[in-house]
Amino acid sequence: MTDATINLHADFARVIDAALDALEAAGTLPGTLSRSAVTCEPPRDPSHGDLATNAAMVLAKPAGTNPRALATALAAELEKEPRVVSAEIAGPGFINLRLTDDAWRGELALIGSAGADYGRSTMGGSKVVNVEYVSANPTGPMHMGHCRGAVVGDALADLLAFSGHQVIKEYYVNDAGAQVDVLARSVHMRYREALGETVEIPEGLYPGDYLVPVGKALAEEFGDKYAKAAEADWLILFRTRAVAAMMDMIRSDLATLGIHHDLFSSEAELQASGKVDAAEQWLRAHDLVYDGLLEAPKGKTPEDWEPVVLPLFRSTKFGDDQDRPIKKSNGAWTYFGADLAYHFQKAQTADALVDIWGADHAGTVKRIKAAVAALTSADGGTPKPFEVKLVQMVQLLRDGEPVKMSKRSGNFVTLSDVVEEVGKDVVRFTMLTRKPDAQMDFDFAKVVEASKDNPVFYVQYAHARICRNLRKGADEGFAPSSANLDLLGDEELALVKLAAQFPRTIEAAAAAREPHRIAFFLHDLASAFHSFYNLGNDRPDKRFIVAQDSAMTAARLFLAAQIGQVIRNGLAVLGVEAAQEL
């Protein structure tokens, strides 16, 4: 199988490295310099060349030489590479490389041989990354407030896997808080209703009809045993059954989006196992938790504030504003304390952690990052990488007007209803068309609109157009072939140059933990494809199928097939199926 990681951009990073080795051997550069800041990437202005490197700029000072002088020596070495037409020095010492057309034709052939592996990377080095996402309270079906974080987290996990990481997709089940007791009481109301009582759901309970089947199931199993019983007799049972039913519903809802977690971790089980207590003892042993007094909250005066001794985590040592309590005065764990123990457990089995949170949790990012830094470095090691990605809410519209809420769900629009109406692929791609921390409108009419202003349609239409041309070519006796790629000129090679950026886009997106970059890249590639395709409207010689020229047709169909391959690969990373026809 072709090594898809040896793409042109990665290969030229090695070419630059070899040229620097030659300068070291010649004594032009000392052999002790770090090259970690050296880059090889397309210049912002394509007219400047195909690739650019900052090697002379970043190495000149530590080498004790002038950037342009070093650039001159490095350019001379780079021009020895057969695929380099010229190495031109720009500004204070950047080097712009112009490559032969055959270099790009070779990359096009590589896409063809690598197939679904084109763009795959080994940059992750098989390191284990735990990506925790969704983690919605198990109190009802998934709604569109959860959707964006679910898609961002799932796409990020798949992106990290494609870039060489081992990934754990985790869902943290918040089943130990007061909200699950409220759920149990709500289900008890539905249980009594199933027994024939007329009930009104009081303020503060969950009113959604989705709890009706849970109540019916309990009524069928237990009859009226718990109808008049004291809450203490049924609360734990009803809570357990209700949470299980809600998690089944949540798994089903997520499956409609193609999301399947590897691990579901229960907060209640974590606490019952004693692991939270063990984490506290570990923290105390490392002098990271102590018993102390909290400062009075802002707005409180000494007269109306009664200080209480609480176990406090030394988060100020790690950049937080103040030390944080891990337990309440009644001995119950604070949210922060439970999260602390949970992240402590996650860190035991992963090299890096990523959490996808709603933007409304922004205020707790600093303290949990401080906690993870402490937990993973207390024994003298380097803190494990930990990032929190914040996701803004989505406003649902229909033709520009806010969407009415769902009666079934009580007060929100369910995810399953949205997926049923517009489809999984539309939902997933749309959620990645903006940075996750930017506001987003999801308009039911616009996301299915057949328009170039709709990025979902625009990318899928490019792939469908390619498939249609390949089918048409086959019907007319033409097959894609790499035998005559020398027939492809500047306009076709411009497409190849853009497609060739896919592997480096994968690595950059993975490093930044930003899967939306793949969606942006696919939109750019689709736009370039449509522009070239449309040339054939007025110029028959620019069409993919030129009846009088079988060699050109075979080469262009090969080009189309590989552009389609890159689009498919990118969509697959995002969990979206490429459309064969529209």
Swiss-Prot record:
Entry GO terms, CC: cytoplasm
Keyword check for ATP-binding: yes
Keyword Transmembrane helix: no
Alphabetical list of SUPFAM superfamilies matching this protein: Anticodon-binding domain of a subclass of class I aminoacyl-tRNA synthetases, Arginyl-tRNA synthetase (ArgRS), N-terminal 'additional' domain, Nucleotidylyl transferase
Chain location of the short sequence motif 'HIGH' region per the record: 136-146
BP term (GO), one: arginyl-tRNA aminoacylation
Superkingdom of origin: Bacteria
UniProt keywords, alphabetically: Aminoacyl-tRNA synthetase, ATP-binding, Cytoplasm, Ligase, Nucleotide-binding, Protein biosynthesis
Subcellular location: Cytoplasm
SMART domains (alphabetical): Arg_tRNA_synt_N, DALR_1
Xref: InterPro entries: aa-tRNA-synth_I_CS, aa-tRNA-synth_Ia, Arg-tRNA-ligase, Arg-tRNA-synth_N, Arg-tRNA-synth_N_sf, ArgRS_core, DALR_anticod-bd, Rossmann-like_a/b/a_fold
Reaction equations catalysed: tRNA(Arg) + L-arginine + ATP = L-arginyl-tRNA(Arg) + AMP + diphosphate
EC number(s) given by UniProt: 6.1.1.19
The family this protein is said to belong to: Belongs to the class-I aminoacyl-tRNA synthetase family.
Subunit record text: Monomer.
Descriptive protein name: Arginine--tRNA ligase
Gene source species: Novosphingobium aromaticivorans (strain ATCC 700278 / DSM 12444 / CCUG 56034 / CIP 105152 / NBRC 16084 / F199)
Gene: argS
